[in-house]
């Protein structure tokens, strides 16, 4: 479909693969949560509010992780923060398998969320700063495509491993990235443009936070914060509840895992088409079009009743939603200069994670009060449309532009 010159460079290929695999592990952990909570709801007899609280706890940790890891990465380096966040979420995930109570499990998932929330924006900034401008968006979307690999892995683990060895096996597998961090320590380096600005690393943290709200960057910051909030709100509200919603629609737990696996496979072509279009038609085109199509498929999924209709709607939902995520991760670092790029990206992601906190808990609260599934998904339709409008009206096109220093 397209030829990417940057990936003909061995160094760039190694960077994309190294950061991508860490990204895949993150996605696997998030995906496993959606399957584990469906099993725990039955085994521990959790209420809908507890299910919502559990999935929200992870996002609360991600709020803190994204906010502070981005700023720390601007001071201490992208590589160092990437490694520490990877180790943190791996350790917390492994220990989650030993949790004997709901409260302990929630506490451990909070720390896992801190690591997850910190790793993602730092990894996208690292890759964005390391490849040529003409292919930067495409390469970052391909980085995001590893997320689909992680979700596919989580669905396979849920379908083949967890029914035999229990939900604890999912968390134990989630501890494997700790071993991968040893490899990352020698396989990646901070981007040259970051190393060249050593004198600006010790700038006070508060000044970095304020920098994203100066007159030059305020419009972009407002747009990004709206975009991130609406996308994360809708994603975590819909996808973390997918297996549970399938069960509520009358399918068995194992059958729901099978259907979600099929839907998850659609994420890969979603990323690949977004990677093609993002350098051909621009960031705004990809984000607006993919978000609006996500909104339409959300309405269809919420109202679908038959297995065929649910799977078809779920495939469209996965295809366009994850393609939009790829565009968002490519677009965000491009709107800030090197000295506070990771801070700006992290703060936008952190604000978005607030949506990830609210949505799963809100879904549980609404369902407990007999609000219908179609009505819940109309809420996500509205959220996604707001995000698309923010990009269309406030966004600045960055296709082909060099990153600001």
Label every model-predicted segment.
Residues 34-64:
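Extracellular/periplasmic helix-loop-helix junction of adjacent transmembrane segments
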Residues 143-186:
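Helix-loop-helix hairpin linking two adjacent transmembrane segments in secondary transporters
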Residues 1-28, 42:
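Cytosolic juxtamembrane N-terminal segment immediately preceding the first transmembrane helix
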Residues 45, 77, 98-104, 132, ...:
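Helix-breaking motifs and short loop linkers at transmembrane-helix boundaries and internal kinks
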Residues 33-34, 216-271:
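Extracytoplasmic gate region of multi-pass secondary transporters
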Residues 97-108, 163-165, 303-313:
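Helix-loop junctions at membrane interfaces in 12-TM secondary transporters
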């Amino acid at each position: 479909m397209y030829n990417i010159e940057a990936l003909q460079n061995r160094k760039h290929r190694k960077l994309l693969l190294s950061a991508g695999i860490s990204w895949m592990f993150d996605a696997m952990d998030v995906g496993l949560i959606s399957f584990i909570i469906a099993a725990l709801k039955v085994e521990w007899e959790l209420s809908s509010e507890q299910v919502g609280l559990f999935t929200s706890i992870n996002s609360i940790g991600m709020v803190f992780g994204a906010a502070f890891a981005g700023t720390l990465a601007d001071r201490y380096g992208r590589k160092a923060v990437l490694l520490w966040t990877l180790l943190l979420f791996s350790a917390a995930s492994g220990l989650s398998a030993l949790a004997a109570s709901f409260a302990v499990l929630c506490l451990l998932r909070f720390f896992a969320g801190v690591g997850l929330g910190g790793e993602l924006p730092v990894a996208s900034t690292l890759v964005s700063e390391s490849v040529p401008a003409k292919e930067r968006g495409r390469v970052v979307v391909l980085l995001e495509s590893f997320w689909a690999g992680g979700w596919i892995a989580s669905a396979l683990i849920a379908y083949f491993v967890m029914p035999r060895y229990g939900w604890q096996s999912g968390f134990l597998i989630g501890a494997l990235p700790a071993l991968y961090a040893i490899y990352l320590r020698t396989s990646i380096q901070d981007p040259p443009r970051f190393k060249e600005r050593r004198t600006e690393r010790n700038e006070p943290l508060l000044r970095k936070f304020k920098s994203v709200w100066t007159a030059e960057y305020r419009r972009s910051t407002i747009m990004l914060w709206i975009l991130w909030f609406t996308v994360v709100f809708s994603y975590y509200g819909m996808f973390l509840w997918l297996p549970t919603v399938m069960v509520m629609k009358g399918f068995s737990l194992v059958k729901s895992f099978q259907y979600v696996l099929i839907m998850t496979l659609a994420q890969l072509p979603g990323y690949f088409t977004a990677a093609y279009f993002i350098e051909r038609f621009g960031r705004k085109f990809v984000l607006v079009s993919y978000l609006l199509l996500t909104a339409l498929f959300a309405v269809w999924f919420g109202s679908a009743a038959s297995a065929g209709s649910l799977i078809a709607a779920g495939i469209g939902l996965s295809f366009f939603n994850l393609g939009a995520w790829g565009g968002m991760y490519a677009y965000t670092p491009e709107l800030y200069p090197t000295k506070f790029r990771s801070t700006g990206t992290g703060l936008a992601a952190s604000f978005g994670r607030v949506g990830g906190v609210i949505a799963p808990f809100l879904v549980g609260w609404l369902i407990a009060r007999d609000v219908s599934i179609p009505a819940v998904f109309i809420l996500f339709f509205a959220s996604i449309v707001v995000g698309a409008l923010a990009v269309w009206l406030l966004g600045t096109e960055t296709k082909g532009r060099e990153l600001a220093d």
